[in-house]
Amino acid sequence: MKRLAIFCLFFFVQPTFAIGCINMKDNWIECLAQILKSEGGYVDDPRDNGGATNFGVTKKTYENWVGREVTKEDIKNLTIEDVAPIYKDRYWARVRADELVDGADLLLFDLSVHSGPRRSVKIAQETAGTVVDGLIGPKTVAAINAMDQTEFIKKFSENRLAFYKRIEAWKHFENGFRNRVKKTQIAAQQMVK
C-alpha cells in the first residue's frame, strides 16, 4: 500500500499538491491511495445513482465543486490532481480524519466517500456508543480514539455492512459492497500502530 501511495504522490499528483500534503497527517496520502484503488476510473453504470463517475467523484459532486454544469466528457477527463482536493475538503476534513487514530481515519474517510460524511459519522457514532446525530465533534472523536482499534475496526465494518444490506442498491452491488468493506477493514487494521 505504501508503494501505491508513493506512486500516486510522485507520478500522478503535481508537485505543488504534494508539497501541500507535507503538513497533513502522515497517512493522508496512503488513505487517498486506498480510496483511489477502490474507486477506480471512469464508470457510468445506470444502476448506480451516482451516474457518471471518475476516481469516485460523481458528476454532481464535481459540478458542485467547480460551480457549473459539466459534461460526461469532463468527468472522463478528470485527473487525480483534480479530485484530490475534493477528497480532502468534502470527505477527509468533514469526518475530521486528521484527528482520528490511524485505521479509524481510513474507515470514516472511505465510507464518507462511498455514502456521504453524515452516514459515515453516524456509523462511527453507533460503533463508539455516542449520540448518533451524524455530526462529528470532540466527544465522538474522543470516543473513537479511546476504543480498542481492532474492536472499532471490526464493529464499524459490521455496522457498515448492515447499512448496505438495508439499501436498494444492495441487490445489484452486494459483491462490490462486501469486497470494499473487507478490503477497507484489512487496510485499516494494517494501519493500526
Residue ranges and their predicted role:
Residues F17-K193:
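Cell-wall polysaccharide-cleaving catalytic domain and substrate-binding groove, primarily
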Residues L4-V13:
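Sec-dependent N-terminal signal peptides
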